[in-house]
């Protein structure tokens, strides 16, 4: 899917919250993207980070917001990832409510300003895809659970679902976004020690992915001088996952601002969770 927008260059104007380091940028940009990686709303953990992110969106006024998916952690359906038929209805409802609360706390304050909204895109992640896996293994649950429970259309302009068994891809301003990009015919995510470099060499375009929870960034220059940016965007949750153990220490937690986005090139700004807390908490 490709979004074609006709944006005028806005005048360089300082944001009202001039004390914010990411608001002092005198804008000459074509477009600004805000990337939200893997929020993993979970019933056992609070969603306070959504309040901080809402304040950032109000101050930043991005043109496009891309949620890379896995906002709904859905631990009640984790067994279906392993091909097991395991489901507890009450736990599923709590999982859904956690994700819905995150959505409401994120977009409620932004909409309350009654200002122009950014174009909002949601990419289905593998955790949301657990619903489809559960229905494939237990079709009798049709009507009890469903993708519609996520209520994404209420707050997002475009919802990019899985294409078969692999994440859907959307192109915006020359950047391809997906929850993850596949490494080959088996449909496994591109990963490894240097995943952004792997994305760049395998795909040959500017791409941004989530899924791995780590941060990695690579820029390559084509023979004609154009820049290809490959980004693995980290995650946006502030708790440690019990199952991850020491891998929690490897995660980068925050959001990414892309300024001056044009034809796949941009100026990145990495806004960590700790920075958001210092400014807005």
In which residue ranges do the predicted regions lie?
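N-terminal active-site segment of His-dependent metallophosphoesterases
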Residues: 1-104
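Core dinuclear metal-dependent hydrolase active-site scaffold
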Residues: 6-28, 33, 168-197
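Active-site neighborhood of phospho(di)ester-bond hydrolases with catalytic His/Asp-centered motifs
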Residues: 35-37, 64-70, 119-125, 177-179, ...
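Short, glycine/acidic-enriched loop or turn micro-motifs at the edges of active sites
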Residues: 41, 73, 128, 182, ...
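A short acidic (Asp/Glu
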Residues: 45-46, 75-79, 131-136, 188-190, ...
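Active-site neighborhood of divalent metal-dependent phosphoester bond hydrolases
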Residues: 77-164
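Acidic, glycine-rich loop-and-strand cores that form catalytic or ligand-binding grooves
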Residues: 143-152, 170-176, 197, 201-204
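Conserved beta-sheet core of the metallophosphoesterase superfamily
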Residues: 178-273
């Amino acid at each position: 899917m490709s979004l074609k927008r006709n944006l005028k260059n806005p005048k360089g104007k300082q944001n009202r919250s001039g004390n914010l380091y990411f608001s002092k940028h005198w804008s000459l940009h074509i477009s600004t993207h805000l990337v939200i990686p893997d929020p993993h709303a979970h019933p056992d953990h609070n969603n306070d980070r959504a309040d901080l992110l809402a304040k950032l969106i109000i101050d930043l006024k991005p043109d496009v917001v891309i949620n890379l998916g896995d906002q709904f952690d859905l631990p009640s359906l984790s067994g279906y990832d392993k091909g097991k038929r395991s489901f507890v209805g009450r736990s599923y409802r709590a999982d859904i409510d956690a994700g819905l609360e995150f959505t409401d706390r994120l977009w409620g304050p932004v909409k309350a300003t009654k200002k122009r909204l950014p174009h909002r895109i949601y990419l289905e992640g593998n955790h949301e895809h657990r619903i489809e896996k559960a229905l494939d293994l237990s079709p009798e649950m049709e009507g009890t659970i469903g993708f519609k429970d996520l209520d994404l259309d209420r707050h997002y302009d475009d919802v990019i679902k899985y294409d078969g068994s692999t994440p859907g891809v959307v192109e915006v301003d020359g950047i391809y976004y997906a929850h993850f990009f596949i490494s080959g015919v088996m449909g496994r995510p591109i990963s490894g020690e240097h995943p952004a470099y792997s994305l760049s060499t395998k795909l040959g375009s500017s791409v941004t992915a989530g899924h791995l929870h780590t941060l990695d960034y690579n820029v390559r220059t084509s023979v004609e001088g154009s820049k290809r940016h490959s980004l693995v965007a980290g995650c946006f949750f502030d708790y440690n996952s019990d199952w991850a153990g020491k891998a929690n220490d490897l995660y980068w937690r925050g959001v990414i601002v892309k300024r001056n986005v044009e034809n796949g090139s941009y100026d990145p700004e990495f806004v960590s969770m700790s920075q958001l807390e210092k400014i807005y908490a």
